[in-house]
Amino acid sequence: MRAVVIESYGGPEVLAICEVPAPEPGPDEVLVDVVASALNRADLLQRMGLYPGPSMEYEVPGLEFAGRVASVGEAVGRWLVGDEVMAITSGGAHAEQAVVHADQAMAVPAGMSLADAGALPEVFITAWDALVLQGGLQPGGTALVHAGASGVGTAAIQLCRSMGAEGGVTASGSKCAACTELGASLAVDYTTDDWLAAVRDHTGGRGVDVVLDVVGGDYLDRNVDALAVGGTIVQGGVMGGGKATFGLGKLLPKRATIVGTVLRGRSLDEKVAVSRAFADEVVPRFEEGMLRVVVDRRFDLDDIAAAHVHMEGNANVGKIALDVRTG
């Protein structure tokens, strides 16, 4: 099969399209003919040697995919050959075939193309898990999402709206308008405006129940200030820096919680549990028209280096999708 292979660590030029052996499904796994996938920040970090993937004969990145079941393991009863499925995975999705545990695979939402479904699982599961399962966001609650125009951000905005919560964001320039169109209750241009002051004003000084932050660095101090009493900061990335200094005393009167989260490093049981819960609770919202995948641009698998360059330019609103094969 054809796959993206990281031959050495560095810039986009280290990525190669190679012929590699197809993976073999285990007894509880399904082999999927991948039609579509998508690019995530973790793929860029893995390419640079900063975010190791699972041990593989060939280092193939990719954290999500959609396609058709090609074969099933002997213990699999949930899926049949030809079923359209999507899934998160720890790696290997930027290839013509991928394997995943049968209970981790999810049915593609009715009416959705495989091209869109390939860009759905990673960001929507990440955002839903962070906001609801880790952050405890409830209907009627309030959230602040940094990097609101990213894949996770555009998913988080819609998830807040779909559950009857308010989702405010920070973004840059014209991206704020795109976030507002998706349903953000507040969109602050962090390059020109004081987002903490805007959050305080928008909430009448109360603050927000959940902050979903993938920036890190010096945002932490202001994130604590932006919290309501009993609020939670969910740290899902450190794009702006992995070190921060803030006064611990701020946490005490707010009874605040800081939670770190990442999907790739979780156990199989945890990934199965979150995938099944997502399939039951969130996938129906796509079928009801409450949620959609926001795709900024599509690239063919052969153009994977250009896709990496595009993401590094930070101009995208939503997902950068990959077309692996036609159909």
Regions found by a protein language model. Give the residues of each.
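Short amphipathic alpha-helix with an adjacent loop that forms part of the alpha/beta core around
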Residues: 195-205
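Glycine-rich beta-strand-centered segment in the early N-terminal region that forms part
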Residues: 21-38, 48-92
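Glycine-rich phosphate-binding loop and adjacent beta-alpha segment
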Residues: 218-290, 321-327
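A structural motif shared across PLP-dependent enzymes of the aminotransferase-like
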Residues: 89-102
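Mid-domain Rossmann-like dinucleotide-binding core that forms the NAD(H)/NADP(H) cofactor-binding site
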Residues: 118-193
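N-terminal Rossmann-like NAD(P) cofactor-binding module of classical short-chain dehydrogenase/reductase
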Residues: 86, 144, 211-212
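Short helix-loop-beta connector
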Residues: 80, 110-113, 136-142, 205-206
